[in-house]
Amino acid sequence: MIIAPSVLSFSYDRFNEQLSDLNSSVDWLHFDVMDGNFVPNLSFGPDILKTFRRNSSLFLDVHLMVNDPGYFTDVFANAGADSITFHYEAYNDLRKCEILIEKIHSLYLKAGISIKPNTDVETIFPILDKCDIVLVMSVEPGYGGQKFIDSSLNKIKKLDEYRKQKGLHYVIEVDGGINDRNAYDVIENGGDALVAGSFIFDGNILNNVEKLRNIK
């Protein structure tokens, strides 16, 4: 299991304390980048990523919720990303998605594709052999603290079945409403990486991470 706290929920007034806890307990850090167009909210730019890169050796997982992921790919690659995931819905065109995946790989980064809750997961099957990460949004993207959408479990299961059928090795990452009550179902259906914001940062980080680790 990969635990990937969402930096959207990070308390910057407790930067050193919280990052120290994360550095000692989790696997990835997940950065939701929003442009105010693809999703209603704005989040942060590459300088935040650079700050984390200087202070952490964790895998930095960038999720682009933007209208022009090609532009932001260069910016965040230069800031220290280890992976860049973008939305199929930014293009609604598999060939354009393939081209950007190739570009991300040319920068020696892991490449991921993400889908919103209303997108049929089978839409992206033709390009999954090119992907290192498939990110299932289990809430509508753009806001933290939402309730997990149960129908996401069927998408996760389909992705896992397709992965086994085709002998592929992409990581199935799940983002939205993750907690210690639904994480078991996510893992049971084939999920590999849990993106959690509110659940990890509300209260004691180390204790909350341990609750996820203990899920069998």
Stretch-by-stretch model annotation:
Residues 17-22, 70-78, 119-130, 178-193:
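Catalytic cores of alpha/beta
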Residues 35-43, 47, 117, 125-157, ...:
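Glycine/Thr-rich beta-alpha phosphate-binding loop at enzyme active sites
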Residues 100, 155, 187, 199-216:
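C-terminal helical cap(s) of enzyme catalytic domains, especially alpha/beta-barrels
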